[in-house]
Protein backbone atom coordinates (compact mmCIF):
# COMPACT_ATOMS: atom_id res chain seq x y z
CA UNK A 1 0.00 0.00 0.00
CA UNK A 2 2.87 2.37 0.79
CA UNK A 3 4.57 1.91 -2.60
CA UNK A 4 1.25 2.51 -4.33
CA UNK A 5 0.86 5.79 -2.42
CA UNK A 6 4.08 7.20 -3.86
CA UNK A 7 3.37 5.99 -7.40
CA UNK A 8 -0.10 7.53 -7.65
CA UNK A 9 -0.74 11.11 -8.72
CA UNK A 10 -1.54 13.53 -5.91
CA UNK A 11 -5.24 13.60 -5.18
CA UNK A 12 -7.51 13.08 -2.22
CA UNK A 13 -5.58 10.38 -0.34
CA UNK A 14 -4.70 7.03 -1.99
CA UNK A 15 -8.14 6.88 -3.55
CA UNK A 16 -11.28 8.74 -2.65
CA UNK A 17 -11.79 6.28 0.22
CA UNK A 18 -8.30 4.93 0.97
CA UNK A 19 -5.84 5.91 3.68
CA UNK A 20 -2.27 5.11 4.71
CA UNK A 21 0.04 6.15 7.55
CA UNK A 22 3.80 5.83 8.00
CA UNK A 23 4.75 6.61 11.60
CA UNK A 24 7.68 6.79 13.97
CA UNK A 25 6.61 5.05 17.19
CA UNK A 26 7.67 5.80 20.79
CA UNK A 27 6.88 2.83 23.06
CA UNK A 28 6.69 2.63 26.88
CA UNK A 29 6.44 -0.89 28.41
CA UNK A 30 4.27 -1.29 31.53
CA UNK A 31 4.57 -3.90 34.31
CA UNK A 32 7.71 -5.34 32.78
CA UNK A 33 10.82 -6.13 34.84
CA UNK A 34 12.85 -7.28 31.84
CA UNK A 35 13.28 -4.25 29.54
CA UNK A 36 11.04 -1.45 30.76
CA UNK A 37 12.84 1.66 29.48
CA UNK A 38 10.89 3.86 27.05
CA UNK A 39 12.24 3.80 23.51
CA UNK A 40 11.83 5.47 20.15
CA UNK A 41 13.08 2.39 18.25
CA UNK A 42 9.80 1.69 16.49
CA UNK A 43 7.68 2.22 13.36
CA UNK A 44 4.05 1.76 12.37
CA UNK A 45 2.68 1.15 8.85
CA UNK A 46 -1.05 1.14 8.20
CA UNK A 47 -3.32 1.25 5.18
CA UNK A 48 -7.01 0.78 4.64
CA UNK A 49 -10.25 1.69 2.97
CA UNK A 50 -13.31 3.55 4.27
CA UNK A 51 -16.36 1.38 3.55
CA UNK A 52 -18.61 4.27 4.67
CA UNK A 53 -17.80 7.95 5.21
CA UNK A 54 -16.82 7.19 8.81
CA UNK A 55 -15.90 3.48 9.09
CA UNK A 56 -12.63 2.11 7.71
CA UNK A 57 -10.97 -1.31 7.67
CA UNK A 58 -7.36 -2.06 6.88
CA UNK A 59 -4.09 -3.77 7.70
CA UNK A 60 -1.19 -2.74 9.92
CA UNK A 61 2.38 -3.75 10.75
CA UNK A 62 4.34 -2.24 13.63
CA UNK A 63 7.51 -2.95 15.54
CA UNK A 64 9.32 -1.68 18.61
CA UNK A 65 12.45 -2.53 20.56
CA UNK A 66 12.98 -1.65 24.20
CA UNK A 67 16.37 -2.04 25.87
CA UNK A 68 17.63 -1.87 29.44
CA UNK A 69 21.11 -2.24 30.93
CA UNK A 70 21.58 -4.17 34.18
CA UNK A 71 24.84 -3.78 36.10
CA UNK A 72 26.77 -6.76 37.39
CA UNK A 73 24.85 -9.10 39.64
CA UNK A 74 24.82 -12.78 40.49
CA UNK A 75 22.09 -14.90 38.92
CA UNK A 76 21.25 -18.31 40.40
CA UNK A 77 20.70 -20.28 37.20
CA UNK A 78 19.97 -23.58 38.97
CA UNK A 79 20.53 -25.22 42.36
CA UNK A 80 24.17 -25.90 41.46
CA UNK A 81 25.05 -23.05 39.08
CA UNK A 82 25.36 -19.28 39.37
CA UNK A 83 26.61 -16.59 37.01
CA UNK A 84 27.95 -13.11 37.84
CA UNK A 85 27.65 -10.70 34.90
CA UNK A 86 26.23 -7.44 33.64
CA UNK A 87 23.50 -7.69 30.99
CA UNK A 88 21.85 -5.78 28.18
CA UNK A 89 18.19 -6.77 27.88
CA UNK A 90 16.24 -6.30 24.66
CA UNK A 91 12.53 -6.83 24.03
CA UNK A 92 11.46 -6.82 20.36
CA UNK A 93 7.75 -6.79 19.44
CA UNK A 94 6.24 -7.21 15.96
CA UNK A 95 2.41 -7.04 15.83
CA UNK A 96 0.46 -7.13 12.56
CA UNK A 97 -3.10 -7.75 11.46
CA UNK A 98 -6.43 -5.99 10.92
CA UNK A 99 -7.29 -2.42 11.87
CA UNK A 100 -10.71 -0.84 12.28
CA UNK A 101 -11.10 2.96 12.27
CA UNK A 102 -13.92 5.38 13.00
CA UNK A 103 -13.32 8.98 11.87
CA UNK A 104 -15.56 11.71 13.25
CA UNK A 105 -15.52 14.53 10.65
CA UNK A 106 -14.33 13.08 7.34
CA UNK A 107 -14.94 16.28 5.38
CA UNK A 108 -12.59 18.35 7.60
CA UNK A 109 -8.87 18.93 7.16
CA UNK A 110 -8.48 17.94 10.86
CA UNK A 111 -9.93 14.45 11.25
CA UNK A 112 -10.01 12.89 14.76
CA UNK A 113 -10.55 9.14 14.92
CA UNK A 114 -10.71 6.05 17.14
CA UNK A 115 -9.08 2.82 16.04
CA UNK A 116 -8.74 -0.80 17.15
CA UNK A 117 -5.96 -3.12 15.95
CA UNK A 118 -6.10 -6.92 16.31
CA UNK A 119 -3.80 -9.72 15.24
CA UNK A 120 -0.83 -11.92 16.08
CA UNK A 121 2.35 -10.61 17.69
CA UNK A 122 5.84 -12.06 17.46
CA UNK A 123 8.16 -11.17 20.35
CA UNK A 124 11.81 -11.81 21.13
CA UNK A 125 13.14 -11.52 24.66
CA UNK A 126 16.98 -11.40 24.69
CA UNK A 127 19.72 -10.99 27.29
CA UNK A 128 23.23 -10.15 26.07
CA UNK A 129 26.14 -10.77 28.47
CA UNK A 130 29.81 -10.72 27.56
CA UNK A 131 29.88 -12.44 24.13
CA UNK A 132 26.79 -14.60 24.81
CA UNK A 133 23.07 -14.26 24.20
CA UNK A 134 20.14 -16.03 25.85
CA UNK A 135 16.75 -15.56 24.22
CA UNK A 136 13.18 -16.76 23.98
CA UNK A 137 10.77 -16.28 21.05
CA UNK A 138 7.00 -16.40 21.32
CA UNK A 139 3.78 -15.71 19.43
CA UNK A 140 0.70 -14.23 21.06
CA UNK A 141 -2.52 -12.34 20.38
CA UNK A 142 -2.36 -8.52 20.14
CA UNK A 143 -5.05 -5.88 20.76
CA UNK A 144 -4.54 -2.12 20.69
CA UNK A 145 -7.03 0.75 21.01
CA UNK A 146 -5.82 4.06 19.56
CA UNK A 147 -7.00 7.68 19.46
CA UNK A 148 -5.53 10.03 16.90
CA UNK A 149 -5.90 12.86 14.46
CA UNK A 150 -4.99 13.23 10.81
CA UNK A 151 -4.23 16.80 9.73
CA UNK A 152 -4.07 17.90 6.10
CA UNK A 153 -2.51 21.32 5.39
CA UNK A 154 -4.21 21.58 1.97
CA UNK A 155 -7.76 21.07 0.71
CA UNK A 156 -6.80 18.23 -1.65
CA UNK A 157 -5.70 16.06 1.32
CA UNK A 158 -2.90 14.47 -0.70
CA UNK A 159 -0.32 14.43 2.12
CA UNK A 160 -0.87 15.23 5.79
CA UNK A 161 0.38 14.62 9.29
CA UNK A 162 -0.67 11.88 11.68
CA UNK A 163 -0.53 11.91 15.50
CA UNK A 164 -1.85 9.08 17.71
CA UNK A 165 -1.81 7.78 21.29
CA UNK A 166 -2.16 4.03 21.85
CA UNK A 167 -2.30 1.30 24.48
CA UNK A 168 -1.52 -2.30 23.58
CA UNK A 169 -1.70 -5.71 25.21
CA UNK A 170 -0.27 -8.98 23.89
CA UNK A 171 -0.53 -12.47 25.38
CA UNK A 172 3.13 -13.29 24.66
CA UNK A 173 5.19 -15.07 27.32
CA UNK A 174 8.91 -15.65 27.71
CA UNK A 175 11.65 -16.97 30.00
CA UNK A 176 15.32 -15.98 29.82
CA UNK A 177 17.82 -16.91 32.55
CA UNK A 178 16.00 -15.97 35.80
CA UNK A 179 13.56 -13.52 34.14
CA UNK A 180 10.06 -14.22 32.89
CA UNK A 181 7.27 -12.31 31.16
CA UNK A 182 3.58 -13.18 31.05
CA UNK A 183 1.76 -10.68 28.85
CA UNK A 184 3.09 -7.45 27.34
CA UNK A 185 1.46 -4.09 28.19
CA UNK A 186 2.57 -0.92 26.42
CA UNK A 187 1.48 2.63 25.74
CA UNK A 188 2.99 5.26 23.50
CA UNK A 189 2.55 7.69 20.68
CA UNK A 190 3.02 7.80 16.92
CA UNK A 191 4.06 10.72 14.70
CA UNK A 192 4.10 10.46 10.95
CA UNK A 193 2.72 11.14 7.51
CA UNK A 194 -0.78 10.44 6.23
CA UNK A 195 -1.69 9.72 2.61
Where are these regions (language model features)?
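Outer-membrane beta-barrel translocator domains and adjoining extracellular loop/strand segments
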Residues: 32-39, 69-76, 124-133, 173-180
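Membrane-embedded beta-strands of outer-membrane beta-barrel proteins
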Residues: 22, 43-45, 96-100, 114, ...
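Outer-membrane beta-barrel pore domains and translocons
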Residues: 23-29, 62-64, 117-121, 164-170, ...
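Predominantly the C-terminal beta-signal and adjacent terminal strand-loop region
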Residues: 66-72, 84, 143, 148-195
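Short glycine/proline- and aromatic-enriched beta-strand/turn motifs that initiate or cap beta-hairpins
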Residues: 11-57, 192-194
